[in-house]
From Swiss-Prot:
Molecular function per GO: DNA binding; DNA-directed RNA polymerase activity
The keyword Lyase belongs to this UniProt entry's keyword annotation: no
Assembly: RNAP is composed of a core of 2 alpha, a beta and a beta' subunit. The core is associated with a delta subunit, and at least one of epsilon or omega. When a sigma factor is associated with the core the holoenzyme is formed, which can initiate transcription.
GO cellular component: DNA-directed RNA polymerase complex
Highest taxon in the source lineage: Bacteria
Keywords: DNA-directed RNA polymerase, Nucleotidyltransferase, Transcription, Transferase
Record InterPro entries: RpoY
Family: Belongs to the RNA polymerase subunit epsilon family.
GO biological process per UniProt: DNA-templated transcription
Full protein name: DNA-directed RNA polymerase subunit epsilon
Catalytic activity: RNA(n) + a ribonucleoside 5'-triphosphate = RNA(n+1) + diphosphate
């Protein structure tokens, strides 16, 4: 499953929509909730990011992300 994670680069400042960034993770999980938990754990262990939202991408959404040119899987 591919998850899109929206985040702020630091926890020091209050979140601002204009500064929101995204990364993509491939997670092997039994269900969506387990995948979100694993994604959050991976990011918290490997980055100082402030996570805003974690979204499971549908097949159509994934195709759109790939076509937009911003899609790149992040590995830790």
């Amino acid at each position: 499953m591919i998850y899109k994670v929206f985040y702020q680069e630091t926890k020091e400042r209050s979140p601002r929509r204009e500064k929101t960034r995204a990364l993509y993770l491939e997670i092997e999980a039994a269900n969506e909730l387990e995948g979100r938990i694993q994604a959050r754990k991976l990011i918290e262990e490997n980055t100082p990011y402030n996570i805003e939202f974690i979204e499971l991408l549908s097949d159509k959404h994934l195709e759109y992300e790939k076509e937009s040119g911003t899609f790149e899987l992040t590995e830790f």
